[in-house]
Amino acid sequence: ILDDYNRESLSINISYSFPSEKVIEIVEQVIEWRGKPESIRTDNGTEFIAHAFTNFCIREKIEHIKIQKGKPTQNSYIERFNRSYREDVLDAYIFEDLNQVRKATEIFMDDYNNEHPHESLGDKSPIEFLNAVNCGKLTAQSTHTSLPQLTAIH
């Protein structure tokens, strides 16, 4: 899960399958940690179009924005993130088991969130940007105008 506001990677689930129930569990964990988003943008994967996920969004009053089929540019933040993750983790190593993938993913997320500058964030990392906004050194509007929103990894 990627936060559109500051491009922070909030969760990456490493598993052989990703049913809607697991998606809901992960989103609930993120909500408990960071608060409820106004919306969640996803592709049209089966885990996101399932009744369970749709009902969860309705129950939680979270707008579920589904990108149009064949239009990955409507989900550009996550597409770019997935590319970085694929290049830096999945394509960079040969893993023997999922635990090794999880460990490499933890290291990647820490680096991405704390060290990786984003042009759209004034060349700050996601955490640097969030800290600057929270300390009053920046206003969110001075850098971008996105509404708080989560983008789900597909």
What are the residue ranges of the model-derived segments?
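Hydrophobic "anchor" residues
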Residues: E8-S9
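Short catalytic-loop micro-motif centered on adjacent basic/acidic residues
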Residues: I12-N13, S39-D43
